[in-house]
Amino acid sequence: MNSNKTGIITMCRKAGKLAVGMDMVKKNCAEGKACAVFITTDISEKSFKEVRFTCAKFSVKLYRLDMTMDDMWYGLGKKAGVIAMTDGGFAKSCAKGLEPIEIDPDEFDI
């Protein structure tokens, strides 16, 4: 678990700039509020495909954290495999050192 990333995620949540869970992430992406989306290493294949589609559709960068859902639970008090940050500063800090996941928009016929 990366304690630096956990700290950033926790601060983001306390600032009210974090969407937790698939439904909230999709809503924030659709509204244009999401600056970046982050997934855990143990997200299901179905959820991974769904979040890739959402990020491709709304042109939001997607990153994979070196964290599990249990690590996320430790930092947030809520078990989640996908989060979105609605603040550019927090998103940039959390994405530092991570490579965005490449998404081919043609894969989804968007």
State what each model feature region is.
Residues N4-I39:
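N-terminal first-folded block
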Residues W73-I110:
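C-terminal structural segments of small proteins and small subunits
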Residues A30, A34-R52, S59-K61:
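N-terminal positively charged helical leader segments and presequences
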Residues G7, D23, K27-A30, K49-F53, ...:
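Solvent-exposed alpha-helical segments within well-ordered globular domains of core cellular machineries
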Residues M1-S3, A15, I103-D106:
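Conserved catalytic alpha/beta core of Sir2/sirtuin-type deacylases, generalized to analogous enzyme cores
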Residues D23, D42-I43, M67-D70, G88:
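Short, ordered loop/turn segments at secondary-structure junctions
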Residues T54-I83:
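Mid-chain, well-packed structural core segment of small domains
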